[in-house]
């Protein structure tokens, strides 16, 4: 049986929500602008699917050029949707730590080129164990904390240690490091004096 889909010409007031409604001319213009920005550079774009939500739109953007040929998805469930829709490369820029989700991650890695971020030796070993059992390879990128306090290593030594472990274990492909845009402000002197945690965020030359 075919899945129900709203027909062309359905009134906006009759559409179920949530519903993706696009101005295709504006979408095409935006994709062209992004493609033109990146296509002649060494830096390529990996669109985050929280912006587009749809494998069809991801394919449209990839065809425009200027991308790495894949997307970024916040969690395993979103990555599954993208791979099911034919996207060949997915980066998950967060840690995947529970046994069940690591298994789903590894199953996905058997269908597409999948990279996930890590910030602990324990997580790296868990992913390696499950990936090896399923005879797949999972890409590993070390997340670097850039003062967002969301995750990531906070020292060069920690990052080097995790990288060396990842390079030694089976079932893994070490891909490098990843970080979010740095979050720096200019705190007042008294804030430094009274907040040791704040002081630890800043390195002065």
Predicted regions and their residues:
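A charged N-terminal "starter" segment
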Residues: 1-107
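Aromatic/hydrophobic pocket-lining residues that form the small-molecule binding cavity
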Residues: 27, 31, 54, 75, ...
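Structural preference for beta-strand elements that scaffold enzyme active sites
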Residues: 44-46, 68-70, 89-91, 113-115, ...
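Active-site beta-loop-alpha junctions enriched in small/polar residues
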Residues: 52-54, 74-77, 95-97, 119-123, ...
């Amino acid at each position: 049986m075919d899945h129900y889909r709203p027909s062309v010409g359905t009134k906006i007031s009759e559409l179920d929500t949530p519903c993706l409604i696009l101005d295709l001319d504006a979408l095409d213009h935006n994709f062209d602008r992004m493609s033109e920005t990146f296509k002649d550079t060494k830096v390529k774009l990996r669109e985050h699917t929280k912006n587009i939500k749809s494998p069809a739109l991801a394919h449209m953007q990839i065809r425009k050029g200027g991308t790495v040929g894949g997307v970024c998805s916040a969690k395993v469930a979103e990555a599954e949707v993208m791979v099911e829709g034919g996207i060949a490369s997915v980066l998950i820029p967060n840690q995947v730590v529970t046994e069940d989700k690591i298994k789903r991650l590894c199953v996905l890695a058997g269908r597409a080129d999948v990279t996930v971020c890590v910030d602990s030796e324990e997580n790296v070993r868990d992913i390696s164990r499950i990936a090896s059992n399923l005879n797949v390879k999972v890409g590993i990128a070390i997340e670097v904390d850039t003062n967002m306090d969301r995750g990531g290593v906070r020292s060069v030594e920690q990052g080097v240690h995790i990288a060396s472990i990842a390079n030694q274990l089976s079932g893994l492909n070490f891909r490098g490091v990843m970080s979010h845009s740095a979050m720096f402000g200019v705190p007042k002197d008294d804030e430094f004096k009274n907040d040791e945690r704040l002081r630890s965020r800043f390195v002065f030359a």
